[in-house]
Amino acid sequence: MEEFRKEIVFESQNLERETKLTIFGSYGFILLAFPLVGDEYDEQVDCRFVEGVSDYIKNGIFRIVYVPTIENRIWKNGDKSLEERSGLHFKYNSFLVDEVLPKIFKMAGSPTPIITFGCGESGYFAGNSFFRHPDLFYGTILIDAFFDIRRLCGDYFDTNCYFNSPLDFLPKLEEEYWLIHLRTRKHIYLCVDEKDGFSVSQATQLSQILNNKSIKHTFEKYNISSENKFDIWSHIFFDIVKRYF
């Protein structure tokens, strides 16, 4: 896939460092992917997901754009207080909306549909980004994700944490502007390995909330005979892409 790969390197004002977007493909809608390990695209892990859908990329169905995340640099940074980490998460949201999306639209030549994607902890960032901004994103593919920010912040919980915790803010969401966007999105996928009790519980809670809000979505449990998380996640990802795209 190297012939379809390019990078956009830039200085982020919100993250206060140089960062980059890793892009595969030249045409189609955008699959905004959050790295599975670490905060950056990983050649050994993330590449298997790219290779597995290479035909879709080559045929211009979609492009995959890997965006940096903040799990390790911010939430697992013991040198900063939890209040500071929460504040940096706020800046990360601004980074996505004010810096990443304009660069993606410029690359595409116009505003283009964007679906977020992530597994495990990266699934939290993919899901949170979508549910916070359903007016900007067209859907999300979430595999073994969690939706309660307490998984990152522990007992610390401020207003910013609340608005970055879908299991907390979605039940109380009443504004029609956001609900209309959520109810018209056709690509919301909650997928779990049924052997992962925590992920099943998180997805079940979120699915119940979405049902209560009349938000259509697909909730699927998989039984895959493997103990390797990356094998399980890639199997589920390929299945969703094959069946729905």
Region spans (language model):
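Non-catalytic cap/lid and distal C-terminal segments of serine-dependent acyl enzymes
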Residues: M1-F245
